[in-house]
A protein has these predicted regions:
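Generic ordered-secondary-structure signal
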Residues: 8, 26, 43-44, 57-59, ...
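Structured beta-strand/loop patches that form or line metal/cofactor-binding pockets in enzymes
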Residues: 16-60
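Alpha-helical support elements that line or immediately flank enzyme active sites
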Residues: 69-81
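C-terminal binding/interaction regions
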Residues: 1-21, 30, 80-149
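Short, surface-exposed, polar/charged, turn-prone segments marking secondary-structure boundaries
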Residues: 41-42, 51-52, 74, 84-87, ...
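Short, thiol/selenol-centered motifs that function as redox-active sites or metal-ligating centers
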Residues: 61-67
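Secondary-structure capping and boundary motifs in well-ordered enzyme cores
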Residues: 37, 65, 117-121
Length: 149
């Protein structure tokens, strides 16, 4: 028998998203939408001089899987770099597609394994990482533009 999609653990995660408040001052901001399911997320980030996340603010309107993914991301996001986030998104997409068996860069994402056969939910699961990457990239552009000529 197939594992239920909305497990007790996923539902618990969906109600425990950290950093669920936008930042007043941020280095970068982004808003993204998952086209298939309509989930939406806004993200604000602050970076240190070494280009690692020091603060994050989230506003998410998504299904329980998207919220659970945001919660798992939020648990371990502080101190992460852009290459780490991009590698995690790459692994997450490959894991959901059945191409790899685990997400070594962010092991807690394995809690979303019940969603692997549900391709229509993959966009909501990837949305938190796509949005934080976009906010990070916006911060990098803003910092570059702020450099003296």
């Amino acid at each position: 028998m197939a594992e239920p999609l909305y497990t007790r653990d996923i539902l618990k995660l969906a109600t425990s998203i950290p950093f669920e408040e936008r930042l007043e001052i941020a280095d970068g901001r982004a808003e993204k939408r998952a086209p298939i399911c309509g989930s939406q997320m806004a993200c604000d980030v602050c970076l240190d001089d070494n280009q690692h996340i020091t603060e994050i603010g989230l506003d998410i309107s998504a299904c329980a899987l998207g919220q659970a993914s945001a919660a798992l991301m939020g648990q371990d996001i502080i101190g992460r770099s852009l290459p780490e986030l991009k590698e995690t998104l790459r692994q997450l997409k490959a894991y959901l597609a059945g191409e790899i068996e685990d997400v070594t860069s962010w092991p807690s994402l394995m809690a979303l394994s019940a969603a692997r056969p549900h391709k229509g939910r993959h966009g909501a699961i990837c949305l938190p990482f796509e949005t934080v990457i976009a906010a990070f990239e916006a911060a990098m552009v803003a910092k570059t533009e702020a450099l003296p000529a």
